[in-house]
Amino acid sequence: MWNQIYNPLGSAALSTLAAAIPVVTLLVLIASGKVKAHLAAIIALILANLVAIFVFTMPANMSIRASLLGVVTGVFPIGWIVLNVIFLYRITVETGRFELLQRAIGGVTTDRRLQLLLIAFAFGAFFEGASGFGTPVAITAAILIGLGFSPLAASGLSLIANTAPVAYGALGTPIQGLASVTGLDPYTLGAMVGRQLPFFSLLVPFWLIWAFAGFRGMMQIWPAILVTGVAFAIPQFVISNYINPWIVDIGASLISMGCLILFLKVWQPKELWLSPKLRGNDESAATMKPPKPMDTTKLTQPQLWGALLPWIIVCIVMLIWGTGMFKSWANAIFVWNYPVPELDKMIMKVPPVAARPTPEAAVFSFTYLSFTGTGMLLAALVSGVLMGISPAKMIVEYGRTIRLCAISLITISAMLAIGTLTRLSGVDATLGLAFAATGVLYPFFGTLLGWLGVALTGSDTASNVLFGNLQKITSEQLGLSPILMSAANSSGGVMGKMIDAQSIVVASTATNWYGHEGTILRYVFLHSIALACLVGVLVMLQAYVYPFTAMVLK
């Protein structure tokens, strides 16, 4: 048995600096653009092992086993999702159905800004709600690149858009995780998050279009942006506060998409924005072929249904795969839980990170049938059959997809290994305790702790499990609402999603722009920090300033 140590150097400052070495190295190497993402991840993983073993005194066999657990987790379920999303996209291109989808979207609007609202924000939120875990970025980035957007625009804007829905992703999994470690009521936590994120559900669509087209380009379509944001934010609040936190994203996204499409039947911008490039310096534009003019010829009914068929199948399958009933049924048929020897329940999380000494689980759960990626593969295979692709051709295309994604899968696995190792070694808890020592400013920095957690782990759920109890304990010691600060961990965390290395690799893979992760990170980094700080300001107001304090649930 090994107890985690959070101040191994006897100095909080020095221990925090040591704990930051792996993640800072990873971000700096990727942002430099001079080191490929998979090499940066491997270097950072080696450093994480050295820090865990020689600074935090984690036994070497535990450190290596934790890394291997992370590697496998990177393939299943995360890499498995990416692989099958790309496979689906490739067979729709191969059969010409994606070109029909382009025409269908062009029939709604040829304006690139409005396409972003429809695809990146509203459609992406649906997939976040149904499955989460990288699915929305993979799908929306692939669709945007297919529509002719530049690689940087498709990847970067998909990441920015996938923020406001994240706290309720995968049918409320982050809220469930937060409730499990804090002991607080999940409905109350979900409702409190629903009193924070709607402000940003209204803001993010404006932010998204400003990032793409500049202030003037944004103001030209402000009515459509307002409709999209309001139609998402109000249902997000109502569903989370008066129904449940499990269906928030699905309900809000469908209402937002429907309202935008209906609004565009009676309103269109006076000046169309047809450029697929980011306004200003878009270095990815040089790699693009000149975009073909979008064919806006009205589709026949059979063509329209043919274009939408694969995506309708995906929506249905993802909804089914996300339900607890299906997961219970599928896992009853097949599940393999592998407790890692000499690691599972052999590490103790201790106060102040946990209320009492708590053994850390280290189990690889191979729930193959209920994996989101398996549902995506089934959707792709069914779509392929209905689109007339032979089994032999699908096998060949799947082999090509594996070759295309191989390096990305290695990268994702190495990054998950870093996240797993830092969690089990207590390295990330040391970083969290540094934020917890900020006193009266804790509502702001506690929110940034959630942001850091997602940036480190790549998951709002993992961040909530990692820091949720720390938020509860610290807030009680400071006389703050534990409901407020636990919810702030999740709300602040959503803004870290766009800079976590795993999501960036998913975006670069989906846009076939692998090797440019540094460019993507540099593009989204300031957006991420700015939005996280705004969430922190809101939480500060809710902690101390009336009437915002009246929003806090007891």
What label would you give each PLM region?
Residues 113-125, 151-164, 185-202, 211, ...:
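Alpha-helical transmembrane segments of multi-pass membrane proteins
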